[in-house]
UniProtKB/Swiss-Prot annotation:
Source lineage: Eukaryota, Fungi, Dikarya, Ascomycota, Taphrinomycotina
Residues bearing PTM Phosphoserine: 381
GO molecular function: guanyl-nucleotide exchange factor activity; phosphatidylinositol-4-phosphate binding
SUPFAM superfamilies (UniProt xref): DBL homology domain (DH-domain), PH domain-like, Winged helix' DNA-binding domain
The protein, known as: Rho1 guanine nucleotide exchange factor 1
InterPro entries, per database record: CNH_dom, DBL_dom_sf, DEP_dom, DH_dom, PH-like_dom_sf, PH_5, PH_domain, Rho-type_GEFs
Record field: compositional bias (Low complexity): 138-149, 170-180
Localization per Swiss-Prot or TrEMBL: Cytoplasm
Chief subcellular location: cytoplasm
One GO-annotated biological process of the protein: regulation of cell wall organization or biogenesis
């Protein structure tokens, strides 16, 4: 089926419309062929004359045309002419080889002007008379009477309503007068040009690329017109179209006037003839010129200008139709010459639709602009700047407009309210706005909404944009936060979108790719603002309707000056004025009604006149404010009674809501509104009594002081209002019976055309109005009045309630938003992370859109959109998705706990810089100065641990990136201070540098002395308790590569492990003079992997482990008793005793698997090996597994590969805490799992553990993970580089009992080992003491 434009008329329809409008049938003549080419000398050509018309009916006058313009009766009727369909044109060119389609005679020459739009879409023909001429003769015309010249001039008259187009014939040799008759076809064509250019083709000086600017009165107008043909002379403005030999007629009272609908800022070129340029200056390449013949060169110059009062010019030609006149005119069949064909409206629409479909754009109205041309005003016309070399070019506005090129804002049909609402949803900037002491989230101001609507409908008229906004308001798409009035163009009025309260997270186009170029701008405007989405309950419900003031006219015969037959044609300015007048009348009527209603409530009208004028002006104003306080209080109570009588009670009696949830629904939606009504009804009654007691009310503060302290129900009501609104909307959308009930009640006259949400917000807004009203009363209160001291007290009490209301409603809103966010989250298959979003203290700190580049990509165009949520405990990265018409948030990566997060700045070279302060941020920003601005600003997030990852995100502005870093850093600092149960105290720093790393530590002498085992030997230093002083260590032993060190102070023995050899050394020799100390330590055991010291069977035992992949040998040593008494021995006996072996071997065990740890139980040893924990008896050396194989809940341990048992701790109640390299759990003394719900998966890969009840510390190279042993909650994380445990603080062999660790820090030239001690804070120690007492 052929394409048909919806506005196009069929053949029969077009003929009937033509006959109805112009009073004569439309005639079509067959095309005739001619042989005379265009722009040649007149030559006798044989042609077949046109047959006479078979029917000639009197034509009705044109609409709004003056009767004085009809042809005089004395003038013979002109032969009929014919007009074909209008064609859009763009470029104006001459074709030397273009044949004329007219026959020529002695008095006529046909000059075609081909106007093209990339395709050959028609021609403009002008008839030239070779004998007559105007009195004005071009000075540049050649002295040849047979050289015709066609010039389009502008009259120099002062009439502001001029049509700038007319044709004059010039000749130097002829002086014949010019006929006053005007060819009607040419008049129709020029009129069509006028209205088309005037309507669609305006150049705004603010658009440097020639972007079209629509008229503010009629933004969308059809460019097609059909006018009748006649030979009568007509005058357009002060311009005359002439043919024949009569003088021209110049009239300023013509009905063909130029409407004032052209943008005043428009500019237009003036195209001069070749002869007007100096000899040394070449004309523009595309100036209109007649092609020069061999003997008779002709000049053709066309001037385009407009009335001087408007300074409007026409920037292009949109639609021309073929114009024919003269008795010898013949038609040429378009099949014979495809370059000179003209199409009807439907054919052109078809070509345009096909072209736009190929380009992949939505079919739109076609318009053309004259771009890249500069002009200046001179007198009554715009004179072209001769210095400019830019030539006028008619180009398509869709191609030349910078808006179209960048596609930052799509153009929509502004008459469709659904399109306007969708665009408004995308462009609005939402945020938290405070009004009357109340904070409204996801709100916007009225003037902002009007400004956005102006950009959407492309108008500079704020009143028109306000009308469109009120059309959306009428369908409840937007509403005032207090539901008091409609949309107003004011920054003081606050509004919200429908359902914004429970749709706070997504935006309608959040899932758009960065390839959508308008998305980049939106991100720049909304980096930190709240973004909304369609309702999570279903599809977005946009308003439906047509805003008739912005609609197009669908009649193809409609023109600017001649509106079509429809009474609702948008071109009828009179109708628009009537509509606006009606609206103004309605507004004035409604405002007058409101004024009358207000007059009845004024104090001056409620008391006798003599009393009203007996008081001073100040007191009169005070009484007016007091009267307003009293009657508004009564109105507030009536509103609450309306809720009770028309909503609550009918709902209890109705069956529209199921009985099982009716009570819960009513309590959730209406909350304690009846409690508020009970409190305020007593207040209103007391105020009314005071008012009735005396016409002049002396004071009211004492009444408020009595009732305001009872405003506690307002707090509970405000906290649950958001949930009530959500339940109401949810029930209304899912329950048709309830929806009908709501509709019926809201239509009652008692509702005053206000929906239920407007009444539900009354209590909170009323509480916020009390301070404003009372401050107004206080303003006009004299000093001696008791209200002068009492009113401030009342205001302070009310503001205290307002502060509590804001806090509670903020908590409720945060909890509500987290609840819906938790419902929207979607995890990858097989993954689920419990973010504890429903916890009572959980908070959403910050949220916003960011960019993420795909792996391996360096182009910013390949970035994708993600949304980042910052909670009080974690970061969440999601991708918005729409699945089954439901907005969901797909979790992009594993949530990052803030305790395990590391922030990095990324410089221009891609290097990561750890973020720790604002100074570093300032340094990076300073380094970026002087370089071209970047499109995106990156920062990097790193998750520590075994399952960690790193991701780089990009903000669109530097301010946005800095804000993200600031929020994350502040929340991390707050969280660390809140959960800092351990404090890290530096013991030694800036001493062990380079390769001399600290690997072990020993404490003795009640913690006053420390021994450091390093790669170069053993160092000793002093230490003062609870003192930040650091003492310089001194080398005591020159034994290299010490990996383990233990001090057995009871036996005055030091054990060292160096290069897998276990040594012993007398402890007292460390304190002696280095000259008396023995040179070498005593060897205890070789090929030792590690050793452990502990208490078993009531004895101090030393276990030296020699481990390999297939087996492990454990030697059990016991210190010699006499060795510990050498301190008090005489020197000789002491010397002999020292030479004895300090350790004697007790047992030697063999285990057929690799061993990783040894632990001491009460009577047995527990060895950690690849098979798990094995219990070994020292009596009979029997070995058995600690875990009972009968417990099937422990099968995961046996099936898990590459899991190492590292530590075991005895807990209260006979339980054991087993710590592996990946997880931890509890078992009882029988080897069965004791706490099924307690299970810890370590974030990192721990290598050592330490217990400081009630906390377990897991040490891995990059951080220390601290968890609570009862709740398994992650309490604290201490990060560092190359962290290693030095002493776990277990037992009381040494008096220290502290936990020591070492880490590396980067110095100026090398790395330094820093030794730290972990201690419980005072609060944690106090909590631990209380737990022990229990």
């Amino acid at each position: 089926m052929d394409y048909r434009h919806p506005n196009a008329l069929g053949v029969n329809e077009s003929s009937r419309a033509y006959e109805e409008i112009f009073g004569a049938p439309r005639k079509r003549e067959p095309a005739r062929t001619v042989s005379t080419p265009a722009f040649m000398e007149p030559a006798p050509v044989s042609k077949k004359p046109l047959p006479p018309p078979t029917r000639r009916l009197p034509r009705k006058p044109l609409p709004f045309r003056s009767t004085s313009l009809q042809p005089p009766s004395s003038q013979p009727p002109a032969p009929p002419t014919h007009q074909r369909e209008a064609s859009p044109v763009k470029n104006i060119e001459h074709s030397e080889s273009f044949p004329s389609v007219f026959g020529t005679s002695n008095n006529h020459q046909i000059v075609p002007l081909t106007l093209k739009d990339g395709n050959d879409f028609g021609a403009l023909y002008a008839s030239l008379n070779t004998t007559p001429h105007f009195p004005q003769v071009s000075n540049h015309a050649p002295n040849n009477s047979n050289s015709p010249s066609l010039t389009w001039h502008t009259s120099s008259g002062d009439d502001s309503n001029q049509n700038p187009f007319f044709v004059r014939r010039q000749s130097q040799s002829s002086t014949s007068p010019v006929s006053d008759s005007v060819d009607e076809n040419l008049l129709s064509a020029v009129s069509s040009v006028t209205e088309s250019v005037e309507t669609n083709l305006h150049l705004d000086q603010n658009y440097p690329y020639g972007s079209p600017v629509r008229s503010s009165k009629n933004p969308f107008l059809s460019s097609n017109s059909r006018l009748p043909t006649d030979d009568s002379s007509h005058t357009v403005g002060s311009h005359s179209f002439t043919s024949g030999t009569h003088p021209p007629i110049v009239s300023s009272n013509s009905a063909f006037t130029l409407p004032n609908a052209v943008t005043p800022a428009a500019q237009a070129p003036l195209i001069r003839s070749v002869s007007e340029y100096p000899a040394n200056v070449s004309p523009p390449a595309q100036s209109l010129q007649l092609p020069k013949s061999t003997s008779n060169p002709a000049d053709l110059h066309l001037s385009i200008a407009s009335a001087s009062s408007h300074k409007n010019i026409f920037s292009g030609l949109d639609v021309f139709s073929n114009v024919f006149h003269g008795p010898s005119t013949t038609l040429r069949d378009r099949e014979h010459d495809m370059r000179n064909r003209s199409f009807d409206h439907s054919t052109l629409a078809h070509y345009e639709a096909v072209k736009q479909q190929r380009l992949g754009v939505e079919p739109t109205a076609r318009s053309f602009t004259l771009s890249s041309y500069k002009s200046r005003a001179s007198g009554n016309s715009l004179i072209n700047d001769r210095s400019s070399t830019t030539t006028p070019t008619f180009v398509n506005s869709e191609a030349s407009s910078p808006v179209h090129k960048n596609k930052r804002r799509r153009r929509i049909y502004a008459a469709l309210l659904s399109r306007v609402a969708s665009e408004l949803l995308d462009r609005l900037q939402l945020g938290d706005i405070t009004k009357d002491g109340l904070i409204y989230s996801n709100a916007f101001t009225g003037d902002h909404a009007v400004t956005v609507l102006m950009g959407i409908i492309h108008t500079s008229d704020r009143n028109l944009a306000l009308l469109v906004g009120r059309s959306l308001d009428a369908q409840k798409f937007i509403h005032d936060v207090t539901y008091d009035h409609r949309l107003r163009d004011s920054h003081r009025e606050i509004y919200q979108l429908q359902g914004t309260g429970y749709r706070p997270f997504l935006r309608a186009n959040d899932n758009a790719s960065i390839n959508n170029k308008n998305h980049h701008k939106e991100l720049e405007d909304n980096e930190s603002g709240t973004r909304i989405s369609p309702s999570t309950l279903g599809d977005t419900s946009f308003p439906n309707g047509i805003f008739t003031l912005l609609t197009h006219c669908y009649s193809p015969t409609c023109a600017k000056d001649h509106p079509c037959y429809s009474i609702s044609c948008p071109r009828r300015l009179e109708q628009q004025h009537r509509l606006f007048a009606k609206m103004r009348a309605n507004t004035e009527q409604s405002s007058s009604l409101a004024f009358d209603d207000k007059e009845q409530k004024l104090w001056i009208h409620s008391v006798p006149q003599e009393i009203a004028y007996s008081v001073s002006d100040r007191e009169r104003k005070r009484q007016e404010v007091i009267c307003e306080v009293i009657y508004t209080e009564r109105d507030f109570v009536k509103d609450l009674e309306y809720l009770r009588d028309y909503w609550i009670k009918p709902l209890w009696a109705s069956s529209c809501i199921p009985e099982r949830k009716k009570e819960k629904f009513i309590r959730t939606v209406f909350l304690n509104a009846l409690e508020v009504q009970a409190v305020n009804s007593k207040l209103a009654e007391a105020l009314t009594k005071r008012q009735n007691y005396k016409p002049i009310v002396d004071n009211i503060a004492d009444i408020f002081l009595e009732h305001v302290p009872k405003f506690e129900p307002f707090i509970r009501y405000g906290a649950g209002q958001l949930y009530g609104k959500y339940e109401f909307e949810k029930e209304k959308s899912s329950n048709p019976a309830f929806a009908k009930f709501v509709s019926d009640v809201e239509r009652l006259k008692e509702s005053r055309k206000l929906e239920l949400n407007g009444y539900l917000t009354k209590p909170t807004t009323r509480l916020a109005r009390y301070p404003l009203l009372l401050e107004a009363v206080l303003k006009y209160t004299d000093e001696g009045n008791p209200d002068k001291q009492d009113i401030p007290k009342v205001i302070n009490i009310v503001r205290g309630f307002l502060s509590r209301l804001n806090v509670e409603s903020g908590k409720a809103e945060n909890k509500f938003n987290l609840f819906h966010l938790n419902q929207q989250l979607v995890f990858k298959p097989g993954e689920h992370y419990d973010l504890h979003l429903l916890d009572a203290n959980r908070q959403l700190i910050f949220k916003g859109p960011l960019k993420k580049r795909s792996a391996g990509s360096t182009s910013s165009e390949s970035a994708s959109d993600v949304t980042l949520f910052l909670f009080d405990h974690a970061l969440l990265i999601v991708k918005p998705k729409t699945i089954n018409k439901r907005e969901l948030l797909k979790v992009f990566q594993r949530p990052i706990p803030l305790l395990l997060l590391q922030l990095f700045l990324v410089d221009d070279n891609g290097l990561r810089i750890p973020y720790s302060s604002k100074q570093q941020l300032a340094a990076v920003s300073k380094a970026a100065n002087g370089k071209p601005p970047s499109r995106f600003y990156p920062f990097s997030l790193q998750l520590l641990g075994r399952r960690g990852y790193e991701i780089t995100l990009y903000a669109t502005t530097e301010v946005s990136r800095d804000k993200w870093l600031e929020h994350i850093d502040n929340q991390q600092t707050l969280l660390q201070h809140r959960n800092q149960w351990f404090e890290s105290v530096t013991i030694c720093s800036n001493f062990f540098v380079g390769d001399n790393k600290v690997n072990a530590i020993g404490v003795y002498d009640s913690g006053r002395r420390l021994l450091y085992g390093t790669d170069t030997g053993v160092y000793v230093s002093l230490r003062k308790a609870n003192s930040p002083l650091q003492f310089k260590p001194v080398r005591a032993l020159n034994i290299p590569n010490i990996s383990q060190l233990e001090v057995i102070e009871e036996y005055s023995l030091l054990l060292l492990l160096s290069d897998k050899v276990l040594y012993s050394y007398p402890l007292e020799m460390i304190d002696a003079d280095t000259t008396q100390a023995p040179k070498k330590a005593r060897k205890v055991s070789g090929h030792t992997t590690f050793f452990r010291v502990g208490i078993c069977l009531g004895k101090v035992l030393v276990c030296a482990v020699k481990s390999s992949v297939l087996s492990a040998t454990i030697k059990v040593f016991e210190p010699v008793t006499n060795y510990s008494k050498t301190r008090n021995m005489p020197s000789l006996k002491k010397f002999l005793t020292v030479n004895q072996d300090p350790l004697r071997i007790v047992k030697e065990l063999y285990i057929p698997t690799e061993s990783t740890s040894v632990h001491f139980l009460k009577n047995k040893l527990c060895v950690g090996c690849t098979r798990g924990f094995e219990v070994v008896s020292l009596d009979n050396l029997e070995t058995q597994s600690l875990l009972d194989p009968a417990d099937t809940s422990l099968e995961f341990v046996e099936k898990k590969e590459n899991v190492k048992p590292i530590a075991i701790y005895r807990m209260n109640g006979g339980e054991f805490l087993l710590c592996y390299s990946q997880f931890a759990f509890y078992v009882n003394r029988d080897g069965w799992r004791s706490r099924p719900t307690w299970f810890v998966v370590w974030e990192g890969s721990p290598q050592n553990f330490a217990l400081s009840y009630p906390y377990i510390l897991a040490f891995e190279p990059t951080f220390i993970e601290i968890r609570h042993v009862e709740t398994s909650e992650l309490i604290h994380v201490i990060s560092g580089r190359n962290i290693r445990l030095l002493a776990d603080g277990r037992g009381k062999l040494g008096d220290g009992g502290e936990i020591f660790y070492a880490c590396d820090q980067r110095g100026e030239n090398c790395e330094t080992s820093v030794v730290c001690s972990l201690r419980l804070t005072s609060a944690a120690a106090h909590a631990k003491e209380q737990h022990v007492d229990k």
